[in-house]
Amino acid sequence: MKSFSTFSILIAICCVLLGSAPTTRSTSAAAKPAVENLSAVTNHELALARNATAKYHDFDRADDEGYEFLHCVPGEGLEYVNWSLVDCTFDIEHPEALHYIDEGNGLRLVGVEYVVPVACTATPPEGFTGTDVEWEFEAEGLPIWALRAALWLPNREGMFAEHNPSIPTQCP
């Protein structure tokens, strides 16, 4: 809330200096990260990822292709990993993990996760072009670099944020 208040004050000062009144629309739009702020190249790559993973809205398809339940993470959802895809490469069209939420009438695909073992590289691997996205280091179990993308459920924290406030914080 503090950053939003500071932001609101800055907007008001700018509006006074520019001679216009602040509006609710401009304040709330600026307070939310938007996909539109990503580069054209990044948006193109996200479209490739969506096209490649759209088939996994049908969970049976993901199951048939080797994605298996790993765990539930509050704010991330139910994570299914295809272990045959875990290697030393970042492949936009073949995410190592899929994130689902259970809406009571089946699973809903909400995002993907790219995974590169730390044994492959001591520094974060390359990711989406033209972004300042930081891979997350996870040391539990197999030490990995992880990069999440909220492809199918908008995340007000940002496309590549670790957690999505729209995803339940409690696991079943």
Regions found by a protein language model. Give the residues of each.
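Primary mode marks residue(s) on the alpha4-beta5-alpha5 output face of response regulator receiver
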Residues: 27-172
